[in-house]
Amino acid sequence: MVLEKIKTLMVNQLSLDSQSITLKTRFREDLGLDSLDALELMMELEKIFNVSISDTTLQNFKTVEDVVLYIEKNLA
């Protein structure tokens, strides 16, 4: 469920192909996201999942899986 919501957001916000987004997808290397893209994406994720993502935490996210695990942990 978390992964699907993240994929939908990335497809809509960043005009990405959902097939290109997996747990192992790297934000910078595979998708070419810059820091502004990442910040905008995380702000939307905070709204959708009602979680808080600090700047330090954001910088530690390298893959989609990192985000999924963080959100799942903070939803519990």
Swiss-Prot record:
Task: Identify the pathway.
Answer: Lipid metabolism; fatty acid biosynthesis
InterPro entries in the record:
ACP, ACP-like_sf, PP-bd_ACP
User: At the top level of its lineage, which domain of life is listed?
Assistant: Bacteria
Q: Where does the Carrier domain start and stop, copy by copy?
A: 1-75
In Gene Ontology terms, what is a biological process of this protein? lipid A biosynthetic process
A single Pfam family, by name? PP-binding
- Coiled-coil-forming residues are none
The text of the family note is: Belongs to the acyl carrier protein (ACP) family.
**Job description of the protein:** Carrier of the growing fatty acid chain in fatty acid biosynthesis.
Protein's name in the database: Acyl carrier protein
* Organism of origin: Phytoplasma australiense
From which lineage does this chain's organism come? Bacteria, Bacillati, Mycoplasmatota, Mollicutes, Acholeplasmatales
This protein's gene is called acpP
